[in-house]
Structure formats: C-alpha cells, structure tokens
Amino acid sequence: MIFKNNYLHWFIQRRLRKNNITAGGHSQYGQDVTVFNLLNKPSHGVFLDIGANDGVTFSNSLYFEEKGWTGICVEPHPTIFESLSKSRQCHLLNACIAATDSVVNFLSVEGPANMLSGIVQYLDKSDLNRIDKEIAAHGGHKHEIQIEALSPETLLQRFNITEIDYLSIDTEGCELSILKVFDFKKTPVKIIGVENGSRSPELFRYLSQQGFYLKKCVGCDEIYMRA
C-alpha cells in the first residue's frame, strides 16, 4: 500500500508540475493567485500563514489581505517578526506551532539566509549544511534560542478562529509535524498550501488520510483541497 501511494504521489505531482507558474500576486511562484482562483475568487475569507517571513517577500497571504480577507501570520524568528509587524495589518504571532504549548529550541539564522531558520529538532544534516554554505557565501551568523510554541487549538482559540479557508505552511522541514497536530474535524480547512521541496510522499499520504486530495503543484508547494 505504501508503494502504491508513493507511486501515486509521484505520478500526480509530475503531471501537475507542468506549466505550474502563475503570474501576479506576491508568492514566489504564484501560489496565492492559484489558491484564490481555486476558491472561485471569494471577496472574504480567513487565512492562516505559518512561516510568514516578513509578510511581504514571497508572501502567500498578503494577496488575500489586500483582497479584504482576515487571518493570522505566524513567524517565529524574532528579527523577521519585527519586519512582519511593520508590514501587515492582520493578527500576528511571534511563535512556533507544536503539539502542545511549550518552549522549543530554534536555530535563528541572521543575515541573507534568515529564511532558512527553523526548529532545531526538524533540521537535518542537509539543512544545516545548506545554512553553513549560505552564511559562508553571503555572510551572517546563526545561534540557538528558545521561543514560545503554541498548539493549533490554543492559537485558534486566542484569535477566535473556527474555520480556515486557506492554510499555508512553509517552515523549513517541520510542515508534516505541524499538519499532524491540526484537528481538521474540529476546525475545517478548505485548502492547504504546503512546501514540499524534497517531494516526499509523506505529506501526500497523510493529507489523503485526512480527506484532502492533491490539486496543484506550484513551485516547491503542493496545494491540497478538501475532497
């Protein structure tokens, strides 16, 4: 069964990655415009952007805010969050998302490679090598800090969110772990955009089990809709 699912994911993403770049919007590859069109261009909605960066550069949610949507941008990196707080009008949270409310070790990368920062637990050897190479080539430094982590339940209760139209996750390696702590039955989600640079079939397998199907592949992101 695992082999069958792996092949199915490979076949679908290979087909969907053809001509997958959409112009317009703020996302790196047009993910925002793609999602907006898939949802039939609604004039209002709710987004949750986990790993929002500075809220502008390659943002997956700014386009929706400009369209009149409301939502939450979550960014754990303290320095980047300062920029986020100056650029966006939606709810903002300087924290990580985890299974329980806690404190986690976070590798904070300062400089041009700051978008590669992440929770230490989920950064593998290749991630760390990439960070070191970027720092060596372009400058900057890295250090570990402790930051707040909230469960999705706590996050959504804090901002009184009962349903999500668009969930975007770009967290440098811990996307699947975040998805696994969401209760999709308690908080319905219409569409999910999740980074899968390694093209791992694990995301496909898990979200299929949760009732989502792979609709589009846009750049490094896979876009899933509720079946």
Regions of interest found by a model, annotated:
Residues 1-227:
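Phosphate/nucleotide-binding beta-alpha loop and adjacent structural elements of enzyme active sites
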